[in-house]
Structures are given as C-alpha cells and as structure tokens.
A protein has these predicted regions:
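Short beta-strand edge/turn micro-motifs at domain boundaries
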Residues: 1, 110-134
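Short, low-complexity N-terminal intrinsically disordered segments enriched in polar/charged residues
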Residues: 1-40
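Short, conserved clusters of charged catalytic residues that mark active-site
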Residues: 10, 17-18, 74-77, 112
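A solvent-exposed, acidic/Ser-Thr-rich amphipathic alpha-helical stretch
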Residues: 14, 31-88, 95-97, 107
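Residue-level detection of beta-strand scaffold positions
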Residues: 22, 29, 33, 58, ...
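A generic structural motif
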Residues: 45, 99-101, 132
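Residue-level signal for well-ordered, solvent-exposed loop/turn and beta-edge residues enriched
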Residues: 50, 105, 123-125
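Exposed beta-sheet edge and beta->alpha loop/turn motif
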Residues: 88-121
C-alpha cells in the first residue's frame, strides 16, 4: 500500500504541476505553450457548447488574446482529484474559477472539469476534456 500511495501522490503532484503550467499559459496568453498541452485529436465536451476539438480550443485562446480579454482561470483549492489510468496516463477532476471584468464589474463563475491526460515519451497531453456545471 505504501508504494501505491507514494505512486498516487507522485502522480497527483505531476498532474497538479501540469495543470498549473497549462493554465499559466492560458492566463498569460502564451499560445505556443498552451497548444502543446493538447493532443491534436482532442475531444472537448462542454455541457453548453457541445463537442469541439483541438482547433476550436486553440482558437478560443487566440481570440481571447486578440480581444485583449482579462479572462483568468484558477483551480479551486481542495477540489483537485487525480486517478491513474494504467497504460495511458491520468484522470484529473476538479473545479475551477474563471474571472473577467465586464462593464466595469468583476464577473466570475465556478465550473467543474475532467481532463484525461496521456503520457507519451515523457510528455503529458490532454486528449479529452469534459467541462460541465455551467
């Protein structure tokens, strides 16, 4: 059990770091870094927007940057769960807070997400996203 707990803790820390790096790129509009976190066969399921893929996901950040939006994402403390997917990678589940200024007022929303991460050649990429509870 100790080895499993240690491996699980290590995986948790690894995915938490990947999440942090991904959304630092999102928050700073670092498109080149951001797009490297997604597999080109990405499937993104959204409870309001339906199913989209890699191009829509990348173009969203590109448009956000072009519009000079101040949209920011922050992981909700204590919400992160990470589970191994043997032979593939990991499942990340949590809640995140998005904020931006609209008409001079701070707008915010907390939503739930599930990311499926695949580890290939020591690199983590998200292959599936489920974004819900909007």
């Amino acid at each position: 059990l100790k080895d499993d707990a240690s491996a699980t803790t290590s995986l948790y820390n690894e995915i938490k770091l990947q999440d942090s790096l991904l959304f630092t790129a999102f928050n700073t509009r670092d498109l080149e870094t951001y797009k490297n976190y997604f597999s080109e066969d990405l499937e993104f399921f959204h409870d309001k927007g339906g199913l989209t893929g890699y191009d829509v996901t990348i173009n969203f950040l590109k448009a956000t940057a072009q519009q000079k939006s101040d949209l920011k994402r922050e992981l909700v403390n204590g919400s992160l769960e990470v589970y191994p997917i043997p032979g593939y990678g990991a499942m990340e589940i949590g809640s995140h807070l998005f904020t931006h200024i609209e008409n001079g007022k701070l707008e915010y929303g907390t939503f739930k997400f599930l990311h499926i991460w695949q580890k290939k050649d020591s690199q983590w990429k998200i292959t599936r996203v489920v974004s819900y509870d909007h």
